[in-house]
């Protein structure tokens, strides 16, 4: 009986050891895979895209409200000022609560393209700048961070402009008379319809302010996030999580301040369609700036700053927090 018990214990021990070895081999294999050159190069882009898509899913209703506020009172200096609550009430009253998520498919595609490229390029640029600075016995400063943010934002915005355009068209479609609405079913439907009816080049309508907005946004978001985090780490005893959240909020404010005028113009240009006379309301970014300033006043560019910040800051916080977490998981 004793020998049978010993045999059973030995067999159990062998099974446990085998399971441990298999688990260790699996973890090692996964770790080795994550550290292959191709995967290491791709991870910043993958993590960036995933983090942006998570943030967009959370923030989409606020983005919808922001766009409607920017399009309200076009061409008029006076009139009632729309409020976030009023816009929300109007959207729900004209349809259903889920209408606040109109354009989500376009928003997710935009993040899959834009944020993947933006954060991926920024991380790649920063890695190279850090390596170069290390060789010289120096550290990466604010100027280098800002340059990396500007370059990454501009490049990513140009690539992601079609998805951005589709998002604005889907979100503004409900403002048109019922007979003139396109009733896009998805981002693919929107992109296909725009390309067929207006030409492929129309997918890059508003590209100039989109690029400038992205550069301004990244200058505020990525550069100030890195700088704020470095300053908070040096000057406070806060936990890493509190420092990250605080740096995200600071970065979101500067990102909003620098980018809102360009976001406003981008929305107007991407929403516009040709009238009965075949002409567009605006001829380009400069013309849009000039007409809005003359007809509606310069402060119109900052209308809805609070809503924009509430959209930008949490989006920045969620994006950067998820990106940091994914970076920690895959380091």
Curated annotation (Swiss-Prot):
Listed InterPro entries: Mit_carrier, Mito_Metabolite_Transporter, Mitochondrial_sb/sol_carrier, Mt_carrier_dom_sf
Solcar repeats: 39-128, 140-231, 239-329
Listed PROSITE patterns: SOLCAR
GO molecular function: transmembrane transporter activity
GO CC terms: mitochondrial inner membrane
The keyword Flavoprotein is assigned to this record: no
Cystine connections: none
Its membrane topology: Multi-pass membrane protein
Signal peptide as annotated in the record: none
Keyword Ligase: no
Keywords assigned by UniProt, alphabetized: Membrane, Mitochondrion, Mitochondrion inner membrane, Repeat, Transmembrane, Transmembrane helix, Transport
Residue spans crossing the bilayer: 42-62, 103-121, 148-168, 199-219, 245-265, 309-329
Cross-referenced Pfam families: Mito_carr
Family: Belongs to the mitochondrial carrier (TC 2.A.29) family.
Biological role stated in the UniProt entry: Catalyzes the transport of 2-oxoglutarate across the inner mitochondrial membrane.
Name of the protein in its database record: Putative mitochondrial 2-oxoglutarate/malate carrier protein
Lineage: Eukaryota, Fungi, Dikarya, Ascomycota, Pezizomycotina
């Amino acid at each position: 009986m004793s020998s049978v018990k010993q045999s059973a214990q030995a067999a159990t021990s062998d099974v446990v050891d085998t399971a441990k070895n298999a688990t260790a081999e699996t973890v090692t294999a996964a770790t080795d895979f994550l550290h292959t050159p191709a995967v290491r190069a791709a991870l910043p882009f993958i993590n960036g895209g995933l983090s942006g898509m998570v943030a967009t899913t959370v923030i989409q209703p606020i983005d919808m409200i922001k766009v409607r506020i920017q399009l309200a009172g076009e061409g008029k200096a006076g009139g009632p000022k729309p409020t976030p609550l009023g816009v929300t009430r109007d959207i729900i009253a004209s349809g259903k609560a889920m209408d606040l998520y109109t354009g989500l498919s376009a928003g997710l595609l935009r993040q899959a393209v834009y944020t993947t490229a933006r954060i991926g390029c920024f991380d790649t640029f920063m890695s190279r700048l850090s390596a170069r600075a290390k060789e010289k016995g120096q550290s990466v400063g604010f100027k280098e961070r800002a340059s990396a943010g500007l370059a990454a934002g501009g490049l990513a915005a140009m690539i992601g402009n079609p998805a951005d355009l589709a998002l604005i068209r889907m979100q503004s479609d409900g403002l048109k008379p019922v007979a003139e609405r396109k009733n896009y079913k998805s981002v693919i439907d929107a992109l296909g319809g725009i390309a067929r009816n207006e030409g492929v080049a129309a997918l890059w309508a508003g590209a100039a302010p989109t690029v400038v907005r992205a550069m301004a946004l990244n200058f505020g978001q990525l550069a100030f996030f890195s700088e704020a985090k470095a300053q908070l780490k040096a000057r406070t005893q806060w936990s890493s999580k509190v420092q990250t959240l605080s740096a995200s909020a600071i970065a979101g404010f500067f990102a909003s301040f620098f980018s809102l005028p360009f976001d406003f113009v981008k929305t107007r240009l991407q929403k516009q369609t040709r009238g009965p006379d075949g002409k567009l309301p605006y001829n380009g970014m400069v013309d849009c700036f000039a007409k809005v300033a003359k007809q509606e006043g310069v402060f119109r560019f900052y209308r809805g700053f609070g809503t924009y910040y509430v959209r930008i800051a949490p989006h920045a916080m969620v994006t950067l927090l998820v990106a940091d977490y994914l970076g920690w998981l895959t380091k």
